[in-house]
Amino acid sequence: MEIHEHIIELPKKVYVGNGILSKLRDYLFQLNVLEPVLVVTGPNVRKIVIDEVAKGLNEIGKIEFIEVLDSSIDEVNRVEEKAKQLNPKFVLGIGGGKTIDVAKYVAYKLNVNFISIPTAPSHDGITSPFASIKGLGKPVSVKAKMPYAIIADINVLSSAPRRLINSGIGDTIGKLVAVRDWKLASKLTGEYYGDYTASLALLSAKHALSCTRIIHRDLKYSVSLLTEALISSGVAMGMAGSTRPASGSEHLFAHAVDLLQPNAALHGELVGMGSIIMAYIHGINWREIRNALDRIGAPTTAKQLGIPNDVIIKALTIAHTIRPERYTILGDRGLTWASAEKVARDTGVIE
C-alpha cells in the first residue's frame, strides 16, 4: 500500500485538572508566551474566569482583550483588524466553541500561536485545528490553527450550563457514525483511512457513552472524562489532517438542519440526533445512542427542539449535498423524501 505524505499537527502541551486556571502564570512561562498577547473572549464568560486569566497574564507585558458575539466572518474580520494593529505573538481563546473558533481562525490567518482555554465542553472545536465560521458560503469546518496548548480547568468546565455539557457528549458520541462513514468511503472510493486515528476517535465516543452513565452521580469526573474525549477527538483530526475521524453523515445532517432553521439547536444536540438516524441506516446499535442521550436529558426528538418534522425530513434529503466530496452512508444521491421520513419515524426522531 502506497503511503502518501501528510503533516500531523499536535498541541505542545495539554493541561487538565481541577482549579488549574490559578496556575496560568506558570503555564504561560513554561510555554514561553511572549507579548503582545490578544485575548479573545465571549459575552457569557464569567467575570471570575476573566479576572483569573488577567491575573495570570499581568507579568507577560502588553495584553489586549476583545469580546466576540458569535463565530461569523464579520466577527473574524473585526478581531483580525484588532490583531493587525496589535501584532500579537500569541492569541488566547477563552470561552465556548464559537469564541475559540474565531480565535483560532484569526491565529491561523495571521500564522501566530494559539492557546485554547475552554469554559464549556460543548463540542470538539475547543481542541481541533478546524473552525466553524458562518458566512463563508458553506456550513462546514475550515482549516484553523491547531492549539499550541490547551488549558482545561475542570472546575470551570463543570460549572458550564448542563445543556452545553450534554451538547459536548452528543458531539462526541457522533464519532461512532463518523468512523463508520470514513471506513465505508475508504472501501468504496479508496480514500485514505487511518486505523490508529479512527481508533482514537472511537475511544472518544466510548468515553462519551460512559459519561452518560455517571454524570448524575459524579459531574466533575464525568466532565473530566468528556474533556479528555474532546481533546482526543481534536488530536485525531490533527493526525488525520482533516475532520474525517470526527465528522460524517451525522454532521452533514446537523449542518443541513442549521441551514434550514438556523439556531434551532446547539451543534452537539443536532449531531446527537443525527447519530441516532445515521446509526440506524448503518445497521448499528442506534438504540444505544438514543438511550444514552435520553439518560442525560439530551434531545432525541425534533419535538423537543421545536423543529418541524418537515425540516428534519428535508435535512435528511439534502445532507449529502453539504459536502459532496465527502462520501458517507448517504451515498451520492442521498435519501428520497419517503426514505427520509421512514428512518426518522422508525428511530422516533419524528412522530
UniProtKB/Swiss-Prot annotation:
Ligand binding (NAD(+)): 97-101, 119-122, 128
Binding site for Zn(2+): 171, 251, 267
Note accompanying the cofactor annotation: Binds 1 zinc ion per subunit.
Cofactor(s) annotated in UniProt: Zn(2+)
EC number annotated for this UniProt entry: 1.1.1.261
Binding site for substrate: 124, 171, 255
GO molecular function: glycerol-1-phosphate dehydrogenase (NAD+) activity; glycerol-1-phosphate dehydrogenase (NADP+) activity; metal ion binding
Pfam families from the UniProt entry: Fe-ADH_2
GO BP term, example: phospholipid biosynthetic process
Protein's job: Catalyzes the NAD(P)H-dependent reduction of dihydroxyacetonephosphate (DHAP or glycerone phosphate) to glycerol 1-phosphate (G1P). The G1P thus generated is used as the glycerophosphate backbone of phospholipids in the cellular membranes of Archaea.
Subunit-level organization: Homodimer.
HAMAP family: G1P_dehydrogenase_A (MF_00497_A)
Protein name in the entry: Glycerol-1-phosphate dehydrogenase [NAD(P)+]
Source species taxonomy: Archaea, Thermoproteota, Thermoprotei, Sulfolobales, Sulfolobaceae
